[in-house]
């Protein structure tokens, strides 16, 4: 039982967050690594919607459910983020409000999982490439003390459940056509 707990709540001995905060360049890298995944998800969303405009609604519903579920769980299943256990401060450039609740489940992991499952479902991006981009970013969040491994496992399960709920959503054709016209206009698609 101790082994399981030490695995699920593992943190590196070195305080990597403190190391990143010791130079201006590393601080900037920390902020970039925290937010770059959202730019990548925007790109994946674009590829998915371009393949089938109805996917927009699936992604939208998945994201709304994810935000509600994540916020609810982070208030109910509360353990402090590892960085606060080490008495580290949240780096400038991150939204403090988002980090003051519990760390379970990982919101980044929730979104990663449902985007991965949408990619598998609609085949718009290389799965190995997707995993090679997001896996280091997720592990980085454990390394710097934003999450424990158990938070990631909770995110995997939650993300899969959210995908199961949202993958069946199909809106009426006239709504989808209106959105397709807007999407094509914004992204200059003929």
Model-derived features with residue positions:
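Membrane-embedded catalytic cores of phosphoryl/pyrophosphoryl-handling enzymes
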Residues: 87-190
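Generic transmembrane alpha-helix motif of multi-pass integral membrane proteins
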Residues: 43-47, 115-118
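Active-site-proximal helix-loop elements at catalytic-domain edges
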Residues: 64-80, 117, 122
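Hydrophobic alpha-helical transmembrane segments of polytopic
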Residues: 33, 59, 63, 130-133
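N-terminal transmembrane-helix/juxtamembrane module of multi-pass inner/ER membrane proteins
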Residues: 1-41, 70-100, 180-190
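Alpha-helical transmembrane segments of multipass membrane proteins
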Residues: 41, 65-70, 74, 137, ...
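Interfacial segments of alpha-helical transmembrane regions
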Residues: 44-69, 152
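Juxtamembrane/transmembrane-helix boundary motifs in multi-pass membrane proteins
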Residues: 22-26, 46, 50-54, 58, ...
């Amino acid at each position: 039982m101790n082994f399981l707990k030490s695995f699920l709540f593992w943190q590196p001995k070195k305080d990597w967050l403190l190391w990143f905060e010791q130079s201006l360049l590393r601080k900037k890298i920390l902020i970039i690594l925290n937010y770059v995944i959202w730019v990548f998800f925007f790109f994946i969303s674009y590829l998915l919607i371009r393949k089938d405009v109805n996917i927009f609604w699936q992604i939208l519903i998945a994201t709304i459910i994810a935000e509600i579920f994540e916020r609810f769980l982070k208030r109910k299943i509360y353990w402090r983020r590892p960085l606060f256990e080490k008495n580290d401060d949240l780096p400038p450039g991150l939204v403090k409000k988002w980090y003051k609740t519990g760390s379970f489940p990982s919101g980044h992991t929730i979104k990663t999982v449902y985007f991965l499952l949408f990619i598998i479902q609609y085949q718009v991006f290389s799965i190995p490439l997707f995993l090679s981009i997001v896996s280091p970013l997720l592990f980085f969040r454990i390394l710097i003390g934003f999450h424990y491994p158990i938070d990631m496992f909770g995110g995997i399960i939650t993300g899969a459940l959210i995908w199961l709920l949202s993958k069946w959503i199909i809106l009426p054709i006239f709504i989808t056509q209106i959105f397709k016209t807007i999407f094509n206009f914004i992204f200059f698609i003929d």
